[in-house]
């Protein structure tokens, strides 16, 4: 094979692989939405795969979500108190048949211990960065942790998830965020998730970024009109809020 033919074949293969990635939803280069609300700035992002979904029958998907928070001037950001996610009315959540883990089982546990104790209830993973800054201290201390999402059960129309993180500064501590998910009727949105973040380091810790991916089948969706929408709202301890929406294309079939 000469060089020209070799380049041609390589180019065709590369295009074919790219097309497969796009069609199957494995490409994750979707742009985030950026919100600037002085003195704060935030980015929200999210997506799902596969992108080809039934128009009428819920299709299991892998769901991902992420966020970043900062002060425009680079100083210590405010502490995140809640994160609300309004999901598309064509999406739903189900934890049926998955073992349950309680908040009590996760408290005071390291990441390894949480995974060992509640492994069968693990439904997602991710990572987070926290900045800790005490009034008398300079500079801010960056702390990174894995995120583990566990099934907390379904009762009375509410699905509960527990998201576990473990920090070692200033003292070792487990941070367990409770997420409550319920159905709503709000135009395009039909699912509301409210994540309540506990105080970190006595209120001196702030979430700077997070990313989380839920296992395939926790979220299912249909694609009747070519897109799925979501809207995130960050609520900070200082009383401010920041909101932004994303629209992700999908291909309906059947």
Protein language model features and the residues they cover:
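Ser/Thr/Pro/Gly-rich, low-complexity intrinsically disordered stalk/linker tracts of secreted
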Residues: 28-254
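Bacterial N-terminal signal peptides that target proteins for export
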Residues: 2-14
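Bacterial N-terminal signal peptides
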Residues: 12-23
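Initiator methionine at the very start of the polypeptide chain
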Residues: 1-2, 29
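Intrinsically disordered, low-complexity repeat segments enriched in small/polar residues
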Residues: 5-8, 23, 27
């Amino acid at each position: 094979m000469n060089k020209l033919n070799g380049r041609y074949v390589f180019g065709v293969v590369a295009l074919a692989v790219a097309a497969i990635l796009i069609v199957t939803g494995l490409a994750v280069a979707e742009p985030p939405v950026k919100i600037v609300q002085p003195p704060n700035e935030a980015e929200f992002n999210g997506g799902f795969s596969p992108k080809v979904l039934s128009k009428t029958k819920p299709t299991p998907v892998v769901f991902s979500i992420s966020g970043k928070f900062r002060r425009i001037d680079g100083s210590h950001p405010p502490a995140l108190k809640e994160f609300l996610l309004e999901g598309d009315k064509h999406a739903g959540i189900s934890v049926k048949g998955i073992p349950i883990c309680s908040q009590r089982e996760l408290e005071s546990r390291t990441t390894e211990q949480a995974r060992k104790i509640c492994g069968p209830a693990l439904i997602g993973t991710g990572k987070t960065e926290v900045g800790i800054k005490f009034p008398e201290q300079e500079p801010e201390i960056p702390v990174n942790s894995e995120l583990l999402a566990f099934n907390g059960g379904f009762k009375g129309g509410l699905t509960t998830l527990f998201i576990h993180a473990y920090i070692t500064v200033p003292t070792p501590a487990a941070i367990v965020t409770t997420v409550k998910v319920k159905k709503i009727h709000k135009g395009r949105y039909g699912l509301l998730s409210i994540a309540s973040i506990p105080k970190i380091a006595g209120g001196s810790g702030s979430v700077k970024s997070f990313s989380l991916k839920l296992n395939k089948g926790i979220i299912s969706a249909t694609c009747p009109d070519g897109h799925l929408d979501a809207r995130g709202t960050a609520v900070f301890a200082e009383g401010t809020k920041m909101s932004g929406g994303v629209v992700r294309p999908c291909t309906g079939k059947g």
